[in-house]
Protein backbone atom coordinates (compact mmCIF):
# COMPACT_ATOMS: atom_id res chain seq x y z
CA UNK A 1 0.00 0.00 0.00
CA UNK A 2 1.16 3.49 -0.61
CA UNK A 3 1.56 5.67 2.35
CA UNK A 4 0.13 8.81 0.97
CA UNK A 5 1.26 11.63 3.02
CA UNK A 6 -2.30 12.54 2.78
CA UNK A 7 -2.16 14.86 5.52
CA UNK A 8 -4.77 16.83 7.18
CA UNK A 9 -4.54 20.29 5.77
CA UNK A 10 -2.96 21.64 8.90
CA UNK A 11 -3.99 25.09 9.97
CA UNK A 12 -1.36 27.79 9.52
CA UNK A 13 0.31 29.86 12.27
CA UNK A 14 -0.56 33.54 12.46
CA UNK A 15 1.91 36.24 11.44
CA UNK A 16 1.27 39.93 10.97
CA UNK A 17 -0.35 40.64 7.63
CA UNK A 18 -1.03 37.72 5.35
CA UNK A 19 -0.68 34.19 6.67
CA UNK A 20 2.74 32.76 5.94
CA UNK A 21 2.56 29.83 3.52
CA UNK A 22 3.34 26.51 5.17
CA UNK A 23 4.86 23.89 2.87
CA UNK A 24 3.27 20.49 2.81
CA UNK A 25 4.32 17.42 0.82
CA UNK A 26 2.96 17.47 -2.72
CA UNK A 27 4.74 14.49 -4.20
CA UNK A 28 5.47 11.30 -2.39
CA UNK A 29 9.16 11.04 -1.64
CA UNK A 30 10.95 8.01 -0.21
CA UNK A 31 9.94 8.92 3.34
CA UNK A 32 6.26 9.07 2.32
CA UNK A 33 6.09 5.47 1.13
CA UNK A 34 5.01 2.77 3.57
CA UNK A 35 7.55 0.00 2.92
CA UNK A 36 5.99 -3.31 1.95
CA UNK A 37 2.42 -2.00 2.03
CA UNK A 38 0.23 -1.60 -1.07
CA UNK A 39 -3.18 -0.58 -2.38
CA UNK A 40 -4.38 -2.93 -5.14
CA UNK A 41 -7.18 -1.84 -7.49
CA UNK A 42 -9.03 -4.56 -9.40
CA UNK A 43 -10.39 -4.12 -12.89
CA UNK A 44 -14.06 -3.20 -13.16
CA UNK A 45 -16.52 -5.86 -14.24
CA UNK A 46 -15.11 -8.78 -12.25
CA UNK A 47 -17.81 -11.05 -10.84
CA UNK A 48 -17.86 -11.80 -7.12
CA UNK A 49 -16.64 -15.34 -7.78
CA UNK A 50 -13.71 -14.01 -9.81
CA UNK A 51 -12.75 -11.66 -7.00
CA UNK A 52 -12.85 -14.50 -4.47
CA UNK A 53 -10.67 -16.66 -6.72
CA UNK A 54 -8.26 -13.80 -7.24
CA UNK A 55 -7.80 -13.34 -3.50
CA UNK A 56 -7.24 -17.08 -3.02
CA UNK A 57 -4.58 -16.87 -5.73
CA UNK A 58 -2.97 -13.88 -3.99
CA UNK A 59 -2.74 -15.81 -0.72
CA UNK A 60 -1.14 -18.84 -2.37
CA UNK A 61 1.35 -16.81 -4.43
CA UNK A 62 2.28 -14.70 -1.43
CA UNK A 63 2.87 -17.75 0.76
CA UNK A 64 4.95 -19.45 -1.94
CA UNK A 65 7.11 -16.36 -2.29
CA UNK A 66 7.61 -16.12 1.46
CA UNK A 67 8.55 -19.81 1.61
CA UNK A 68 11.16 -19.29 -1.09
CA UNK A 69 13.10 -16.77 1.00
CA UNK A 70 16.13 -18.61 2.35
CA UNK A 71 16.31 -16.55 5.53
CA UNK A 72 12.57 -16.15 5.92
CA UNK A 73 10.66 -12.87 6.09
CA UNK A 74 9.28 -10.65 8.80
CA UNK A 75 7.33 -7.44 9.22
CA UNK A 76 4.48 -6.07 7.15
CA UNK A 77 5.55 -8.03 4.04
CA UNK A 78 4.24 -11.23 5.66
CA UNK A 79 0.73 -9.96 6.42
CA UNK A 80 -0.94 -10.48 3.03
CA UNK A 81 -4.36 -8.99 2.33
CA UNK A 82 -5.30 -6.60 5.13
CA UNK A 83 -8.52 -4.75 4.26
CA UNK A 84 -11.08 -4.86 1.46
CA UNK A 85 -12.77 -1.77 0.00
CA UNK A 86 -15.85 -1.64 -2.22
CA UNK A 87 -17.19 1.73 -3.39
CA UNK A 88 -19.83 1.53 -6.11
CA UNK A 89 -18.08 -0.33 -8.97
CA UNK A 90 -14.63 0.01 -7.45
CA UNK A 91 -13.00 -2.97 -5.71
CA UNK A 92 -9.68 -2.54 -3.92
CA UNK A 93 -7.73 -4.10 -1.11
CA UNK A 94 -4.73 -3.19 0.99
CA UNK A 95 -2.00 -5.60 1.91
CA UNK A 96 1.51 -6.24 3.13
CA UNK A 97 3.50 -8.04 0.44
CA UNK A 98 7.11 -8.80 -0.45
CA UNK A 99 8.52 -7.28 -3.64
CA UNK A 100 8.07 -10.47 -5.67
CA UNK A 101 4.38 -10.76 -4.76
CA UNK A 102 3.85 -7.09 -5.62
CA UNK A 103 5.31 -7.74 -9.07
CA UNK A 104 3.15 -10.85 -9.49
CA UNK A 105 0.09 -8.75 -8.63
CA UNK A 106 1.00 -6.18 -11.27
CA UNK A 107 1.05 -8.94 -13.90
CA UNK A 108 -2.32 -10.39 -12.85
CA UNK A 109 -5.06 -10.01 -15.50
CA UNK A 110 -7.49 -9.13 -12.69
CA UNK A 111 -5.49 -6.12 -11.48
CA UNK A 112 -5.81 -2.56 -12.74
CA UNK A 113 -3.03 -1.07 -10.59
CA UNK A 114 -0.74 -1.68 -7.62
CA UNK A 115 0.35 1.44 -5.71
CA UNK A 116 2.62 1.66 -2.67
CA UNK A 117 0.65 3.02 0.28
CA UNK A 118 1.57 6.59 1.18
CA UNK A 119 1.26 9.03 4.04
CA UNK A 120 -1.50 11.63 3.72
CA UNK A 121 -1.64 14.94 5.59
CA UNK A 122 -4.20 17.22 7.12
CA UNK A 123 -4.57 20.57 5.40
CA UNK A 124 -2.65 23.10 7.46
CA UNK A 125 -4.24 26.01 9.35
CA UNK A 126 -3.18 29.23 11.18
CA UNK A 127 -3.87 30.73 14.62
CA UNK A 128 -4.97 34.24 15.66
CA UNK A 129 -7.45 35.27 18.37
CA UNK A 130 -10.84 36.92 17.70
CA UNK A 131 -11.70 36.55 14.03
CA UNK A 132 -15.18 35.69 12.69
CA UNK A 133 -15.53 37.26 9.27
CA UNK A 134 -16.14 34.01 7.38
CA UNK A 135 -19.85 33.56 8.10
CA UNK A 136 -20.64 37.16 7.22
CA UNK A 137 -18.87 36.63 3.91
CA UNK A 138 -21.07 33.61 3.12
CA UNK A 139 -24.13 35.84 2.80
CA UNK A 140 -22.45 39.02 1.51
CA UNK A 141 -22.52 38.15 -2.22
CA UNK A 142 -18.75 38.29 -2.25
CA UNK A 143 -18.51 41.87 -1.03
CA UNK A 144 -15.44 42.52 1.12
CA UNK A 145 -16.29 42.31 4.82
CA UNK A 146 -14.52 43.57 7.94
CA UNK A 147 -12.04 41.12 9.41
CA UNK A 148 -13.97 41.15 12.69
CA UNK A 149 -17.26 39.66 11.60
CA UNK A 150 -19.20 40.95 14.60
CA UNK A 151 -19.75 43.94 12.28
CA UNK A 152 -21.56 41.82 9.69
CA UNK A 153 -24.75 39.79 9.99
CA UNK A 154 -24.73 36.25 8.69
CA UNK A 155 -28.11 35.85 6.97
CA UNK A 156 -29.48 32.35 6.52
CA UNK A 157 -32.67 30.33 6.42
CA UNK A 158 -33.69 28.90 9.78
CA UNK A 159 -33.72 25.31 8.47
CA UNK A 160 -29.93 25.63 8.45
CA UNK A 161 -29.03 22.05 7.57
CA UNK A 162 -31.76 20.37 9.62
CA UNK A 163 -32.13 16.70 8.72
CA UNK A 164 -28.76 16.54 6.93
CA UNK A 165 -25.62 14.60 7.91
CA UNK A 166 -22.11 15.91 7.33
CA UNK A 167 -19.41 13.23 7.51
CA UNK A 168 -15.99 14.54 8.57
CA UNK A 169 -13.10 12.23 7.63
CA UNK A 170 -10.45 13.64 9.92
CA UNK A 171 -8.92 13.33 13.42
CA UNK A 172 -12.26 12.69 15.10
CA UNK A 173 -14.72 15.18 16.59
CA UNK A 174 -15.18 16.36 20.16
CA UNK A 175 -18.88 15.52 20.01
CA UNK A 176 -19.44 16.83 23.56
CA UNK A 177 -18.51 20.37 22.53
CA UNK A 178 -21.35 22.79 23.32
CA UNK A 179 -21.30 24.03 19.71
CA UNK A 180 -22.79 20.73 18.49
CA UNK A 181 -25.79 20.72 20.88
CA UNK A 182 -25.98 16.91 20.83
CA UNK A 183 -25.80 16.73 17.01
CA UNK A 184 -22.31 15.18 17.01
CA UNK A 185 -22.19 11.45 16.30
CA UNK A 186 -19.27 9.03 16.72
CA UNK A 187 -19.26 7.04 13.49
CA UNK A 188 -16.10 5.08 12.65
CA UNK A 189 -12.60 4.91 14.11
CA UNK A 190 -9.99 3.29 11.84
CA UNK A 191 -6.98 3.96 14.10
CA UNK A 192 -5.97 0.83 16.04
CA UNK A 193 -5.62 1.08 19.82
CA UNK A 194 -6.70 4.71 19.89
CA UNK A 195 -9.91 6.07 21.44
CA UNK A 196 -12.53 7.72 19.26
CA UNK A 197 -11.70 11.19 20.51
CA UNK A 198 -10.04 14.18 18.88
CA UNK A 199 -6.66 14.75 20.50
CA UNK A 200 -5.37 16.85 17.58
CA UNK A 201 -8.18 19.42 17.17
CA UNK A 202 -8.40 19.48 13.38
CA UNK A 203 -11.56 17.39 12.99
CA UNK A 204 -13.43 19.31 15.69
CA UNK A 205 -12.40 22.60 14.07
CA UNK A 206 -13.65 21.47 10.65
CA UNK A 207 -16.92 20.15 12.08
CA UNK A 208 -17.52 23.44 13.88
CA UNK A 209 -17.33 25.38 10.61
CA UNK A 210 -19.83 23.01 9.05
CA UNK A 211 -22.38 22.82 11.85
CA UNK A 212 -21.44 24.67 15.04
CA UNK A 213 -24.26 26.72 16.58
CA UNK A 214 -22.06 29.84 16.59
CA UNK A 215 -19.38 29.18 13.98
CA UNK A 216 -21.23 26.88 11.59
CA UNK A 217 -22.74 27.47 8.17
CA UNK A 218 -25.42 24.78 8.66
CA UNK A 219 -26.22 25.26 12.33
CA UNK A 220 -28.72 22.41 12.64
CA UNK A 221 -26.93 19.72 10.63
CA UNK A 222 -25.65 16.53 12.22
CA UNK A 223 -21.89 15.91 12.11
CA UNK A 224 -20.54 12.36 11.98
CA UNK A 225 -17.01 11.68 13.16
CA UNK A 226 -15.07 9.34 10.85
CA UNK A 227 -11.59 9.09 12.33
CA UNK A 228 -8.81 8.21 9.87
CA UNK A 229 -6.08 10.39 11.44
CA UNK A 230 -4.67 10.47 14.96
CA UNK A 231 -2.16 13.24 14.30
CA UNK A 232 -1.36 15.30 11.21
CA UNK A 233 -0.80 12.35 8.87
CA UNK A 234 -2.26 8.96 8.05
CA UNK A 235 -2.09 6.32 5.31
CA UNK A 236 -4.51 5.21 2.63
CA UNK A 237 -4.97 1.92 4.44
CA UNK A 238 -6.91 3.86 7.11
CA UNK A 239 -8.31 6.56 4.83
CA UNK A 240 -9.82 4.10 2.34
CA UNK A 241 -11.26 2.03 5.18
CA UNK A 242 -12.92 5.14 6.60
CA UNK A 243 -14.15 6.50 3.28
CA UNK A 244 -15.55 3.05 2.42
CA UNK A 245 -17.38 3.02 5.77
CA UNK A 246 -18.83 6.48 5.14
CA UNK A 247 -20.15 5.55 1.69
CA UNK A 248 -21.73 2.37 3.05
CA UNK A 249 -23.25 4.20 6.03
CA UNK A 250 -24.78 6.88 3.82
CA UNK A 251 -26.11 4.25 1.42
CA UNK A 252 -27.46 1.90 4.10
CA UNK A 253 -29.15 4.82 5.89
CA UNK A 254 -30.80 6.13 2.70
CA UNK A 255 -29.08 9.50 3.12
CA UNK A 256 -27.56 10.05 -0.32
CA UNK A 257 -29.53 13.25 -0.92
CA UNK A 258 -29.13 14.37 2.69
CA UNK A 259 -25.42 13.77 3.30
CA UNK A 260 -22.09 15.36 2.39
CA UNK A 261 -18.51 14.22 2.99
CA UNK A 262 -15.78 16.73 3.88
CA UNK A 263 -12.11 15.95 3.18
CA UNK A 264 -9.80 18.64 4.57
CA UNK A 265 -6.80 16.54 3.61
CA UNK A 266 -4.10 16.71 0.97
CA UNK A 267 -1.32 14.62 -0.48
CA UNK A 268 0.52 13.78 -3.66
CA UNK A 269 -1.56 12.77 -6.66
CA UNK A 270 -2.84 9.26 -5.84
CA UNK A 271 -5.14 7.71 -8.41
CA UNK A 272 -6.67 4.95 -6.23
CA UNK A 273 -8.21 7.48 -3.86
CA UNK A 274 -9.28 9.79 -6.68
CA UNK A 275 -11.03 6.72 -8.12
CA UNK A 276 -12.73 6.11 -4.77
CA UNK A 277 -14.10 9.67 -4.67
CA UNK A 278 -15.22 9.34 -8.29
CA UNK A 279 -17.07 6.10 -7.56
CA UNK A 280 -18.79 7.66 -4.56
CA UNK A 281 -19.99 10.38 -6.93
CA UNK A 282 -21.32 7.71 -9.31
CA UNK A 283 -23.08 6.12 -6.34
CA UNK A 284 -24.87 9.42 -5.64
CA UNK A 285 -22.73 10.88 -2.84
CA UNK A 286 -21.29 14.41 -2.69
CA UNK A 287 -17.71 14.99 -1.52
CA UNK A 288 -16.18 18.41 -0.80
CA UNK A 289 -12.37 18.63 -0.69
CA UNK A 290 -9.66 21.15 0.15
CA UNK A 291 -7.46 22.45 -2.67
CA UNK A 292 -4.30 22.24 -0.55
CA UNK A 293 -1.86 24.73 0.94
CA UNK A 294 1.20 24.66 -1.30
CA UNK A 295 0.49 27.79 -3.34
CA UNK A 296 0.63 25.57 -6.44
CA UNK A 297 -1.65 24.00 -9.02
CA UNK A 298 -4.08 21.68 -7.23
CA UNK A 299 -4.10 19.23 -10.15
CA UNK A 300 -1.08 17.57 -8.52
CA UNK A 301 -2.89 16.90 -5.24
CA UNK A 302 -5.26 14.19 -4.08
CA UNK A 303 -8.15 14.44 -3.39
CA UNK A 304 -8.22 17.97 -4.86
CA UNK A 305 -7.72 16.51 -8.35
CA UNK A 306 -10.79 14.25 -8.13
CA UNK A 307 -12.82 15.49 -11.12
CA UNK A 308 -16.27 15.28 -9.54
CA UNK A 309 -15.43 16.39 -6.03
CA UNK A 310 -16.14 20.03 -5.19
CA UNK A 311 -12.61 21.44 -4.81
CA UNK A 312 -12.31 24.53 -2.62
CA UNK A 313 -9.60 27.20 -2.55
CA UNK A 314 -9.17 29.79 0.20
CA UNK A 315 -10.03 33.48 -0.10
CA UNK A 316 -9.34 36.36 2.31
CA UNK A 317 -11.96 38.84 3.55
CA UNK A 318 -11.00 41.44 0.93
CA UNK A 319 -11.23 38.92 -1.95
CA UNK A 320 -7.56 38.12 -2.39
CA UNK A 321 -6.09 34.64 -2.62
CA UNK A 322 -3.79 33.86 0.32
CA UNK A 323 -0.39 32.86 -1.01
CA UNK A 324 -0.71 29.43 0.61
CA UNK A 325 -3.89 28.43 -1.26
CA UNK A 326 -3.57 26.10 -4.21
CA UNK A 327 -5.27 27.14 -7.43
CA UNK A 328 -5.87 25.93 -10.98
CA UNK A 329 -8.61 24.76 -13.30
CA UNK A 330 -9.55 21.93 -10.92
CA UNK A 331 -10.57 24.47 -8.21
CA UNK A 332 -14.36 24.87 -8.39
CA UNK A 333 -15.01 27.57 -5.82
CA UNK A 334 -13.36 29.95 -3.34
CA UNK A 335 -14.46 30.20 0.30
CA UNK A 336 -13.24 31.86 3.51
CA UNK A 337 -9.96 30.27 4.57
CA UNK A 338 -7.93 32.75 6.60
CA UNK A 339 -8.29 33.61 10.29
CA UNK A 340 -11.43 31.54 10.83
CA UNK A 341 -12.60 30.85 14.37
CA UNK A 342 -14.18 27.50 15.28
CA UNK A 343 -14.33 24.75 17.89
CA UNK A 344 -11.21 23.03 19.20
CA UNK A 345 -9.98 20.18 21.35
CA UNK A 346 -9.41 20.34 25.08
CA UNK A 347 -12.84 21.15 26.49
CA UNK A 348 -16.50 21.47 25.62
CA UNK A 349 -16.17 25.20 24.91
CA UNK A 350 -12.62 25.39 23.50
CA UNK A 351 -12.02 27.48 20.36
CA UNK A 352 -9.18 28.29 18.00
CA UNK A 353 -8.66 30.66 15.07
CA UNK A 354 -6.89 29.07 12.11
CA UNK A 355 -6.20 29.48 8.40
CA UNK A 356 -5.89 27.13 5.44
CA UNK A 357 -7.93 25.38 2.79
CA UNK A 358 -8.90 23.04 5.64
CA UNK A 359 -11.09 25.93 6.76
CA UNK A 360 -12.35 26.79 3.27
CA UNK A 361 -13.61 23.29 2.43
CA UNK A 362 -16.03 22.99 5.40
CA UNK A 363 -17.58 26.35 4.54
CA UNK A 364 -18.70 24.77 1.27
CA UNK A 365 -19.58 21.43 2.88
CA UNK A 366 -21.73 23.42 5.29
CA UNK A 367 -23.36 25.23 2.37
CA UNK A 368 -24.12 21.86 0.76
CA UNK A 369 -25.79 20.69 3.97
CA UNK A 370 -27.68 23.99 4.21
CA UNK A 371 -28.98 23.71 0.63
CA UNK A 372 -29.89 20.03 1.04
CA UNK A 373 -32.19 20.98 3.92
CA UNK A 374 -33.94 23.61 1.80
CA UNK A 375 -34.15 22.16 -1.69
CA UNK A 376 -34.66 18.92 -3.57
CA UNK A 377 -31.20 18.21 -4.93
CA UNK A 378 -31.44 14.67 -6.31
CA UNK A 379 -27.80 13.99 -7.21
CA UNK A 380 -24.22 15.17 -6.64
CA UNK A 381 -24.35 16.80 -10.07
CA UNK A 382 -27.41 18.79 -9.00
CA UNK A 383 -25.69 19.76 -5.74
CA UNK A 384 -22.57 20.97 -7.54
CA UNK A 385 -24.61 22.87 -10.12
CA UNK A 386 -26.63 24.61 -7.40
CA UNK A 387 -23.56 25.59 -5.38
CA UNK A 388 -21.80 26.94 -8.46
CA UNK A 389 -24.90 28.72 -9.78
CA UNK A 390 -25.06 30.70 -6.53
CA UNK A 391 -21.45 31.84 -6.72
CA UNK A 392 -20.42 35.43 -7.43
CA UNK A 393 -17.96 35.68 -10.36
CA UNK A 394 -14.72 37.53 -10.99
CA UNK A 395 -13.94 38.79 -7.50
CA UNK A 396 -10.82 36.87 -6.42
CA UNK A 397 -7.58 38.71 -7.05
CA UNK A 398 -4.67 36.48 -8.13
CA UNK A 399 -6.91 33.50 -8.87
CA UNK A 400 -4.35 32.47 -11.51
CA UNK A 401 -6.00 30.15 -14.05
CA UNK A 402 -8.75 29.08 -11.65
CA UNK A 403 -12.48 29.51 -12.22
CA UNK A 404 -13.13 32.80 -10.42
CA UNK A 405 -16.20 32.05 -8.29
CA UNK A 406 -16.72 32.91 -4.62
CA UNK A 407 -19.15 31.14 -2.35
CA UNK A 408 -22.59 32.60 -1.62
CA UNK A 409 -25.53 31.10 0.27
CA UNK A 410 -28.28 32.74 -1.79
CA UNK A 411 -29.53 35.32 0.69
CA UNK A 412 -30.11 38.49 -1.28
CA UNK A 413 -29.15 41.21 1.19
CA UNK A 414 -26.33 42.26 3.45
CA UNK A 415 -26.48 44.62 6.41
CA UNK A 416 -24.23 45.92 9.14
CA UNK A 417 -24.99 46.04 12.85
CA UNK A 418 -23.17 47.31 15.89
CA UNK A 419 -21.04 44.67 17.60
CA UNK A 420 -23.09 42.70 20.10
CA UNK A 421 -20.16 40.88 21.69
CA UNK A 422 -16.53 40.01 21.06
CA UNK A 423 -16.93 36.25 21.06
Curated annotation (Swiss-Prot):
Pfam families: Inhibitor_I9 (PF05922), Peptidase_S8 (PF00082). InterPro entries: PCSK9_ProteinaseK-like (IPR034193), Peptidase_S8/S53_dom (IPR000209), Peptidase_S8/S53_dom_sf (IPR036852), Peptidase_S8_Asp-AS (IPR023827), Peptidase_S8_His-AS (IPR022398), Peptidase_S8_Ser-AS (IPR023828), Peptidase_S8_subtilisin-like (IPR050131), Peptidase_S8_subtilisin-rel (IPR015500). Glycans are attached at residues 249, 262, 349, 389. One of its GO terms (cellular component) is extracellular region. It is found in: Secreted. It is an enzyme of class 3 (hydrolase). Its main location: secreted. The keyword Glycoprotein applies. One of its GO terms (biological process) is proteolysis. Residues 1-17 form the signal peptide. The active site is at 170 (charge relay system), 202 (charge relay system), 358 (charge relay system). Keywords: Glycoprotein, Hydrolase, Protease, Secreted, Serine protease, Signal, Virulence, Zymogen. CDD domains: Peptidases_S8_PCSK9_ProteinaseK_like. Residues 18-123 form a propeptide. Gene3D superfamilies: Peptidase S8 propeptide/proteinase inhibitor I9 (3.30.70.80), Peptidase S8/S53 domain (3.40.50.200). Its EC number is 3.4.21.-. GO terms for molecular function: serine-type endopeptidase activity. Residues 37-123 form the Inhibitor I9 domain. The keyword Protease applies. Residues 132-423 form the Peptidase S8 domain. Belongs to the peptidase S8 family. Secreted subtilisin-like serine protease with keratinolytic activity that contributes to pathogenicity. This is Subtilisin-like protease 2. It comes from Arthroderma otae (strain ATCC MYA-4605 / CBS 113480) (Microsporum canis).
Amino acid sequence: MQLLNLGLLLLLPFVAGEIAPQPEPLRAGPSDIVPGQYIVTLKEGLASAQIREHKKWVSSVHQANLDSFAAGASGVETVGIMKNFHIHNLNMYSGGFDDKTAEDLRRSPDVKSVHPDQHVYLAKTVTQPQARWGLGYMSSKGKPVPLHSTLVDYLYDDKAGEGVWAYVLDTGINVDHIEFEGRGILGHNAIPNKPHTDEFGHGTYVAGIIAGKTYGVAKKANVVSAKAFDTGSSTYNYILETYDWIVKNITDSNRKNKAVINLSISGAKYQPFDDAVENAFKAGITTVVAAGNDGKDAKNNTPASSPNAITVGAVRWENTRPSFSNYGKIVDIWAPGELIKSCWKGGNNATSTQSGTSAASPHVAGLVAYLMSLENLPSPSAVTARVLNLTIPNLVKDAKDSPNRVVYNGIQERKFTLPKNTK
